[in-house]
């Protein structure tokens, strides 16, 4: 298997894992799932209503379906600070995510 096809297979695997986790989060607690993923209700409805076949087809894209929510270097660096306790890092992360705009269908 070439390096390119191996990388595409890994992207597909990550995509499928992401979509399945997203669906599970949304089915268990829609509001919390939307918050954790930073997505709009419209996008949440699309994700939760995908059939298994649609989910697998979407995961087979050659592009990553998930992305970093923090585009700011300073923000990401502060979240990765090793000097903080786990509880403080989780609280700080939740506060920062709450201030980020949600993704919507374009």
Curated annotation (Swiss-Prot):
Keyword Manganese appears in the UniProt entry: no
Annotated localization: Cytoplasm
UniProt keyword terms in alphabetical order: Activator, Bacterial flagellum biogenesis, Cytoplasm, Disulfide bond, DNA-binding, Transcription, Transcription regulation
One GO BP: regulation of bacterial-type flagellum assembly
Major site of localization recorded for this protein: cytoplasm
This protein's record includes keyword Cytoplasm: yes
Top-level taxon of the source organism: Bacteria
Annotated GO CC locations: cytoplasm
GO molecular function, one term: DNA binding
Pfam families listed in its UniProt record: FlhD
Entry note about domains: The C-terminal region contains a putative helix-turn-helix (HTH) motif, suggesting that this region may bind DNA.
Function: Functions in complex with FlhC as a master transcriptional regulator that regulates transcription of several flagellar and non-flagellar operons by binding to their promoter region. Activates expression of class 2 flagellar genes, including fliA, which is a flagellum-specific sigma factor that turns on the class 3 genes. Also regulates genes whose products function in a variety of physiological pathways.
Protein family (similarity comment): Belongs to the FlhD family.
Subunit structure: Homodimer; disulfide-linked. Forms a heterohexamer composed of two FlhC and four FlhD subunits. Each FlhC binds a FlhD dimer, forming a heterotrimer, and a hexamer assembles by dimerization of two heterotrimers.
Name of the protein described by the UniProt record: Flagellar transcriptional regulator FlhD
Lineage, broadest ranks: Bacteria, Pseudomonadati, Pseudomonadota, Betaproteobacteria, Burkholderiales
Gene name of the encoded protein: flhD
């Amino acid at each position: 298997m070439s390096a390119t096809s191996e990388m595409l297979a890994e992207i597909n695997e990550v995509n499928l894992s992401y979509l399945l986790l997203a669906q599970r989060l949304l089915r268990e607690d829609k509001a919390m799932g939307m918050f954790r993923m930073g997505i709009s209700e419209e996008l949440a409805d699309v994700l939760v209503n995908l059939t298994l076949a649609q989910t697998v087809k979407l995961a087979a894209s050659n592009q990553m379906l998930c992305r970093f929510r923090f585009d700011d270097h300073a923000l990401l660096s502060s979240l990765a600070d090793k000097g903080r306790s786990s509880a403080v890092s989780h609280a700080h992360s939740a506060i920062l995510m709450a201030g980020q705009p949600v993704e919507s269908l374009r």
